[in-house]
Structure formats: C-alpha cells, structure tokens
C-alpha cells in the first residue's frame, strides 16, 4: 500500500483578511504558522516519514512545508518546487475582499467564479502591476504559459501534467511523498483521484493546515482517505469548525 500526504498551506494573511489570493505571494499568518507546526507534530506522532516533498513557488506553501519537515526532523528531505502546483490564478480578483466583491458583482456571480469548473474570473490586463510575468521565479515559463486568469479546469490541467510527469512515478517507486500546496490545487488532485464529477467538486472544501492522507494501491487507485489529528484518523465531518476554508 502506498500513502500520499496532501496538505493545504496554513492560514495566510489574506485568508485572514478574506481576500482572493491566487498567485499573489502572501505569507502565513500567526495562526498559519501554528497550523503548520501542529501539522508537523501530528505527522510525527502518527509515525509518518517522507522521502521527497513537493510544493509550489509561493511562500505560504513553501514555508508550511519547511515548518512541517523541521517539526518532523526531516529537514534533509529533497524539496521540489513548481509553479504548476501554484494556487489557481484569480485574475483581476486577486487582492480584492471576497465580501466586497460579492456586494459589487452579486453573490451568485462570485460563487460561479469561485466554484464552477470552467468559468474564469475577469482577466488581469498585461499592464496591471499584479501581472508578475517578469518575476524571476517564472523565467522558465514558455510564452503564453503565464496566466491572466484561470478556471478550475485550467488549474487541474497543469496540476495533473505535473502529477503524471513527476509525482506519480515517485509514488510508483515506493517513495513516501508529501505535497504542500493550495486549496484549488489540492481540490484538483482530489477530483482526479476520487473521480469526482464537476458537480461533485463544487462543494469540496480543503481546510488549511490539516494533513489529508490517501492510501493508494499499486496502480495509484485510492483505497481510502482521511484527515489526521493527534489521535490518528479523523473523518472530514469532524474537522474543527474554526478552520478557514
């Protein structure tokens, strides 16, 4: 049996402020730092170890992973970073308060932008200062790869490309893998692994800072999945209500 651990980064400063974050490189809040330390302690107490780790190129996911590995005394584990594990790009919504955006455009429209699989939010203009195509972390992107906006399908496409090329082969060679990433990135992976429909993924929430374990067979088909706490397995319905989605 193969085990894969997925974790959404700890609460970020913009999670706390209820802002659309996307590719904006926002750091963890104090609570997010605590969530990351707790996640590391949970994984260590439950006997987990890792051979390789994957994360995005955004500091909230990177820092979460660093803290987890530090808490587990696994700072030596190789870490691979890729923009393909970044959060969904929210286009012109990035930086905006979600409640204020709902008042401006209507709750139904904002819900469609956030939860539908194939509707993109308004795109950034190329002269928008939020369009960070010159950021050195993206210098290897081919022309046209840097998004102005994304729907969940766009995110899923790049995430699964990376999954099949990089992560799945590691799992198939019996490497113990942890992925520290983002809400929509992990939703994309869960949708793929569990064969969820577009409608099925709409209501899927991934809590910040709580390890999600997938037990997989030799073909990487899920046997079961569960969240972890200090006492071991915990089902989704028992996740603490205070967690910010």
Swiss-Prot record:
SMART domains: PGAM (SM00855). The record marks 182 as: Transition state stabilizer. Pfam families: His_Phos_1. Its EC number is 5.4.2.11. CDD domains: HP_PGM_like. Substrate binds at residues 8-15, 21-22, 60, 87-90, 98, 114-115, 183-184. GO terms for molecular function: phosphoglycerate mutase activity. InterPro entries: His_Pase_superF_clade-1, His_PPase_superfam, PG/BPGM_mutase_AS, Phosphogly_mut1. It catalyses: (2R)-2-phosphoglycerate = (2R)-3-phosphoglycerate. The keyword Thylakoid does not apply. The active site is at residues 9, 87. PROSITE patterns: PG_MUTASE. Pathway: Carbohydrate degradation; glycolysis; pyruvate from D-glyceraldehyde 3-phosphate: step 3/5. Catalyzes the interconversion of 2-phosphoglycerate and 3-phosphoglycerate. Belongs to the phosphoglycerate mutase family. BPG-dependent PGAM subfamily. This is 2,3-bisphosphoglycerate-dependent phosphoglycerate mutase. It comes from Bacillus cytotoxicus (strain DSM 22905 / CIP 110041 / 391-98 / NVH 391-98). The gene is gpmA.
